[in-house]
Swiss-Prot record:
One Pfam family, short name: EccD
Protein's recorded name: ESX-5 secretion system protein EccD5
Subcellular location: Cell inner membrane
Signal peptide (residue range): none
Segments crossing the lipid bilayer: 137-157, 169-189, 200-220, 224-244, 250-270, 272-292, 359-379, 414-434, 443-463, 480-500
InterPro entries in alphabetical order: EccD_transm, T7SS_EccD, YukD-like
Organism lineage: Bacteria, Bacillati, Actinomycetota, Actinomycetes, Mycobacteriales
Protein family membership: Belongs to the EccD/Snm4 family.
Keyword Transport annotated: yes
Organism: Mycobacterium marinum (strain ATCC BAA-535 / M)
Record's keyword terms, sorted: Cell inner membrane, Cell membrane, Membrane, Transmembrane, Transmembrane helix, Transport
An annotated GO cellular component: plasma membrane
Gene3D superfamilies hit by this protein: Phosphatidylinositol 3-kinase Catalytic Subunit, Chain A, domain 1
Amino acid sequence: MTAVADAPQAELEGVSSPRAVVVGIMAGEGVQIGVLLDANAPVSVMTDPLLKVVNSRLRELGESTLEAAGRGRWALCLIDGSPLRATQSLTEQDVYDGDRLWIRFIPDTEHRSQVIEHISTAVASNLSKRFASIDPVVAVQVGAGMVGTGVILASGVLGWWRWHHNTWLTTIFASVIAVLVLMVAMMLLMRATTDADRRVADIMLVSGLAPLTVAAASAPPGSVGSPQAVLGFGVLSIAAALALRFTGRRLAIYTAIVTICGLTTLASLSRMVAATSAVTLFATMLLICVVMYHASPALSRRLSGIRLPVFPSATSRWVFEARPDLPTTVAVAAGGPPVLEGPASVRDVVLQAERARSFLSGLLVGLGVLMVVSLTSLCNPHTSERWLPLMLAGFTSGFLMLRGRSYVDRWQSITLAVTAVIVVAAVSVRYALVLSSPLSVSIVASLLVLLPAAGMTAAAVVPNTIYSPLFRKFVEWTEYLCLMPIFPLAFWLMNVYAAIRYR
């Protein structure tokens, strides 16, 4: 394809007019575009305008435009690919009417490195290669985290004021903050389209639970006590349960909050209604946590919706067939993932298993917090039978440490092991702070150093050692031996035996 060019005007006497040449530019897939170029101008002056003209003509023809690939430059080349000199004109390089040229992108073969003039520039240059820079998504998440931190700190300040002053300031101020933060969280959740947007909304939603709890707890008049605890923890547990139900995310966090606040609400209600003693409340909480440690796998399975298979009955029903509502046959669609024919699919089973893992992790974290608080509160150095809660704490820590080996997920095993270690550390620190004697401080300091050292030694030796079945059975019996005295010691601590004896 050629373009028709006007004939150059005849030169006037005494005046030299610039020459023009009509050349064919090869561009795209077999496309030739005729253009009129100045024969006396340097090639470098005409390259960029020529590229724009060629791309506009390619768009008119429906062809793909010329795009730069990486670092380099555009150049006019002869038909054999040799580039023309950029500083010379077409006439100087023997290019005349009717010649064909080729405009192409020549990659830059030179390696360029950043010039480092100061040590600070070198540090910044190396760090930019190893770490990602702040993008808008991360900036929004950091801002949401700062807002959430400020809301939680403001809730703490308002709660401190309510602890010392019986006024309505805390209730009104915390209610306004809670309404504003929760409204923003709901708007973000409704408009969220990506995981980053949902993460920001979840941060705002979790932080909004703090002022809501403070507002509810400070509403009852009078000094802070069990009525305020019942209302505050009750509202927090209900709000966390609703967030868990309607968002379907952050299952472990909301499950831990519901576990802690639900049991604390029941204990506060017992204290408010029946004036239950602190020892009875903490000992009962300890026993409930031990029972829930055994029931947590089954509870998490039920919460996730996983149904157990039906075992054959004595009448031989379902011996050679599965339950009617369970999938039995694997079907693979064209280009799709394998699914099970029936109401459940492979993806549903994987999703339910992940939900069960999140529920179980939240339960273990919540129960661990309650165990640490209960055992630390029971171990009072000034009681007459101080050895009794110490034995209870020791057996409970041993049970938790050995119980962690039965979990497949390593984070769940770590949660139980950390709970056992924190129980021992918290009880020891309380004894050192309350007794304030050189002997107690020396013993506690030695214990706080030797206990992690023993744990590190066990972590280095146990995974690399193969144990016999007899030794494994011995460890299992040791776990049962640590579990057996917990209930009798707790009943003894609550004076249940004395009440039965003198009844």
